[in-house]
Amino acid sequence: MFKPIRTTHPAIKIINSTLIDLPAPNNISIWWNYGSLLGLCLVIQVLTGLFLSMHYVPNIEMAFSSVALISRDVNYGWLLRSIHANGASMFFLFIYLHAGRGLYYGSYNLSETWNIGVILFLLTMATAFMGYVLPWGQMSFWGATVITNLFSAIPYIGKTLVEWIWGGFAVDNATLNRFFAFHFILPFAIMGATILHIMFLHESGSNNPIGLNADSDRIPFHPYYSIKDTLGYTLAISALSLMVLFEPNLFTDPENFLMANPLVTPIHIKPEWYFLWMYAILRSIPNKLGGVMALFAAIVILFIPPLTSVMNKRSLSFYPLNKTMFWGLVASWAILTWIGGRPVEDPFIIIGQVFTSLYFIYFISSPTISKLWDDSIII
């Protein structure tokens, strides 16, 4: 009996089981589009980054000039740079939407997939941070100085660790060189972790909006969801194109158009918008070590939901109080993002502290409230 080559060829059948004949729930919504959109973002970032690296010079005397050269004299260099810079913003926007969907619909119950997703988030943050340093503008230099200096808060080994990261006694040429090397190699680690993420997801099967087992009623991924993903790609590329062609510097800090100067500190040092909520959490604790611990906890706490989940049903749609708290978490995240871009003064300090507390309260109290709801204590 004849079998299609996609089911028999050793290499093609791997692609087939991932993108063509994959059994998928028949009720997944647009919120399940962001995984494939993140794959698209990763490909865009790797390709544009590869071409940019051909013209970039990782040297403190020439880095800023080489970025200016890319923008002015390299054929379509301005386009590559804008796509790469704004593509990072789109990447993080989709990460937050993807993770938010996972929290809302209980996807963290697929613990291996969720934990690798959190590791992917950490790798992406490290990659983006080091990429932000490479243009060697004022905000690049001072951002690198401030963030790497946080490691000095670690007792006993802090000072040694910071100097080891810097490759000297300050952020200098050695720092820029190693950041460029890691910024180039980490996306390939992200690709490897992505393959593991997909592998574990397909081992257990995708979650769905109602959180029930959908094994009895699945449909092939192609053509149903491949068409749906193509629509997502079209909309995402259109949005990115509008940003790149009309407002390429919307998210760029004006300070970064000035070459790095260790003798002049910017009035307000801040990271890119997608790190502002973490920066607000860091600043909300009036102690260096405490702030670093809060920052670390804000990310590591994402490993907690698979361990603390006691819900009888997966989706928060069935838990009105938890659903209200979830949207409170989203509001807290948005307000912390705003606070991270504000000066360190009242009333921004107290607002940051309040919403930092609310951020952590969600993860601590959500399992208890869902358990009480299941036990019918709350009616």
From Swiss-Prot:
What are the record keywords, sorted? Electron transport, Heme, Iron, Membrane, Metal-binding, Mitochondrion, Mitochondrion inner membrane, Respiratory chain, Transmembrane, Transmembrane helix, Transport, Ubiquinone
Does the record's keyword annotation contain Membrane?
Answer: yes
Q: Name one GO biological process term.
A: mitochondrial electron transport, ubiquinol to cytochrome c
Question: Which residues participate in heme b b566 binding?
Answer: 98, 197
The membrane-topology field of this record reads: Multi-pass membrane protein
Which residues participate in a ubiquinone binding? 202
Q: Which PROSITE patterns match?
A: CYTB_CTER, CYTB_NTER
Residues crossing the lipid bilayer are 34-54, 78-99, 114-134, 179-199, 227-247, 289-309, 321-341, 349-369
Q: Name one GO molecular function term.
A: ubiquinol-cytochrome-c reductase activity
Annotated cofactor note: Binds 2 heme b groups non-covalently.
**GO terms under cellular component:** mitochondrial inner membrane; respiratory chain complex III
Q: Where does heme b b562 bind?
A: 84, 183
Q: Which cofactor does it need?
A: heme b
Q: What else is known?
A: Heme 1 (or BL or b562) is low-potential and absorbs at about 562 nm, and heme 2 (or BH or b566) is high-potential and absorbs at about 566 nm.
Q: What does this protein do?
A: Component of the ubiquinol-cytochrome c reductase complex (complex III or cytochrome b-c1 complex) that is part of the mitochondrial respiratory chain. The b-c1 complex mediates electron transfer from ubiquinol to cytochrome c. Contributes to the generation of a proton gradient across the mitochondrial membrane that is then used for ATP synthesis.
Entry similarity comment: Belongs to the cytochrome b family.
Q: What is this protein called?
A: Cytochrome b
Question: Whose protein is this, by species?
Answer: Lumbricus terrestris (Common earthworm)
**Organism taxonomic ancestry:** Eukaryota, Metazoa, Spiralia, Lophotrochozoa, Annelida
Gene symbol of the encoding locus:
MT-CYB
